[in-house]
Amino acid sequence: MNNILYIGPYKENTGMGRSARRHIDALGYNFDINLSIRPIYFTPYLDTANESGKDYSEFEDNSSSYYDIVIQYGIPNCFEYKKNFGKNICITDIDTFNIKHTGWVDRINLMDHVVVQSEWSKKSLEHAGLKTKVSIIPEPFNLTQFHSNYDTLFKNTNNDFVFYYIGKHQDKNNIKGLLSAFFLEFRKHDDAKLIIKTDMSGFDHQEAEKIITYDIQHVEKVLRVNGNHVQAPHVIIGYYEQEYIMRLHNQCDCYVNVCKAESFGASAIEAALFDKLVITNREIGSNSYINSYNGFEIESMLTNVTSKDFYMENTFTVYEQWKEPFIDSIREQMRKAYETTKIEKQQKLKNFDKDKFSETSFVNNIINL
């Protein structure tokens, strides 16, 4: 049995927090692992309402005199090498390219092994001077949750084809780009809809609603389209329980991931696990698993980051690079997905390997590093 100490932001109501909880779920309930966990905090956004519904007290109360493996998950400048224990593994999310100025690689190089979730993240670290061992291991999921027995979330009496996206309203997620492509490609008479589930850190519901409404109107104005002639998107704002998100996945048809930068893309993977068509930006995190063989790829170009959104002073700076999707390519792939036949869809779904995202696969990959 392996004694493992896991340090991560599992108490946060953030993307990293949800990833950390997935790690713990996979590691903690494996009979070959004696798990101890300790929290670390990167943001003030805590899961105070226990949105996850998890009770990890048994792992928090647990401790060992010696750990075979110490896993640290988070932002690299917080990584510390624990020389008194066994193998030191770090797991980190690398969203952008050209990150040498952050100093992150210097911390990572102190570790025995670094785990990233995508080829994009691996290339970024190597470009920045990575010297330690690196492995690509996707995040784990409880595959039994991905079924069709969820209650419906909305009425779809006309059997419209529903595109959707789940993510924060921030520059890297490129929601304006998605809106632009949808407004240009589909009109009110088309049986296509767009649902966006989003939120904005630091803003209450009313403030976020005003900002997002303005942005939608601004996109219409820039494109010079008449709001009366386009299909208005349905925007869901705020934080919702995971059950709600699963119901949304289950009822929609095609997930559109137009992110400019991401390390993994959990929502895109969840959509694929629900047997939904997925469109993703080429080279970013989710493209390591979803491509033209089992989904749809958006053409994009490497450009300098221009973003007002950052969680640390040296992140998402103009010195970094991300992948800017071409609007015409987003439109083209949305049209292809919309026109996909049942046979074509089944073939794409068949080509997506779900087993690599299982909790068992994750544990085996970590133990065998």
Task: Please state what every model-predicted region is.
Residues 277-280, 296-297:
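Short hydrophobic beta-strand element within catalytic cores of glycosyltransferases
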Residues 1-67:
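N-terminal pre-catalytic "stem/leader" segment of glycosyltransferase-like enzymes
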Residues 5, 155-173, 179-182, 194-196:
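Conserved donor-binding/catalytic core segment of Leloir-type glycosyltransferases
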Residues 205-243:
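Nucleotide-activated donor-binding/catalytic signature segment of Leloir-type glycosyltransferases, i.e.
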Residues 5, 44-128:
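Extended catalytic core of nucleotide-activated donor transferases of GT-like folds
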Residues 103, 140-159:
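Acidic anion/phosphate-binding donor-loop and adjacent secondary structure
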Residues 321-332, 339-368:
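A charged, aromatic-enriched C-terminal amphipathic alpha-helix characteristic of glycosyltransferases
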Residues 260:
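Aromatic "clamp/platform" in nucleotide-sugar-dependent glycosyltransferases that forms part
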